[in-house]
């Protein structure tokens, strides 16, 4: 993304060279083989899955062959999301790699462009899990957390709801945000 946004920066040539070396069908085939080994169904779920979809979405904005090379891996992770989301009874709200809101935020844009069924599934699950959330307690951050579960949820809902619906949802979810409360956020 940096190379796309700032093509004149000194590091751009090195970024393109690294992409040319790494984002090739042979290397993706190795990743797919690793992913398909027995017992790997949950490998990197959901954080790694989502980051790969975000990477593929960015690569699709470039003229190079990288998006086509990475697409089989993106499709494999999308298939895993399709299978996983209906099984997840409750959202995973921790502030770590397992946070489902953060993962779905990353996957949402990719799904909108590349997999309408997954896009609809992400939006439906987000509404199912979070639409009725009110007066968030925001007992965070935890000692081992690097994400704010509350803010990750809010970011996802900002992508799923239209502007007016999100404003109403956010006002109910964090009703004292304008006063800087909860202070941990």
Specify the residue positions occupied by each region the protein language model found:
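Non-catalytic carbohydrate-binding regions of carbohydrate-active enzymes
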Residues: 135, 170-185
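Short acidic alpha-helical/loop segments enriched in Asp/Glu that coordinate divalent cations
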Residues: 121, 141-144, 162-174
């Amino acid at each position: 993304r940096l190379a796309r946004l700032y093509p004149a920066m000194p590091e751009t040539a090195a970024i393109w060279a690294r992409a040319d070396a790494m984002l090739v069908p042979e290397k993706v085939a190795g990743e797919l083989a690793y992913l398909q080994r027995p017992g790997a169904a949950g490998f990197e779920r959901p954080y790694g899955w989502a980051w790969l979809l975000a990477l593929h979405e960015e690569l699709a904005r470039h003229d190079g062959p990288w998006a086509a090379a990475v697409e089989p891996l993106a499709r494999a992770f999308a298939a895993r999301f399709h299978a996983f989301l209906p099984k997840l009874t409750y959202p995973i709200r921790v502030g770590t790699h397992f946070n489902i809101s953060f993962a779905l935020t990353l996957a949402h844009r990719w799904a909108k462009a590349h997999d309408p069924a997954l896009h609809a599934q992400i939006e439906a699950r987000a509404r199912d899990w979070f639409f009725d959330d009110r007066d968030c307690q925001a007992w965070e951050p935890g000692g081992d957390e690097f994400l704010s579960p509350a803010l990750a949820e809010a970011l996802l809902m900002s992508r799923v709801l239209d502007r007016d619906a999100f404003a109403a949802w956010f006002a109910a979810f964090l009703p004292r945000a304008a006063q800087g409360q909860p202070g941990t956020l």
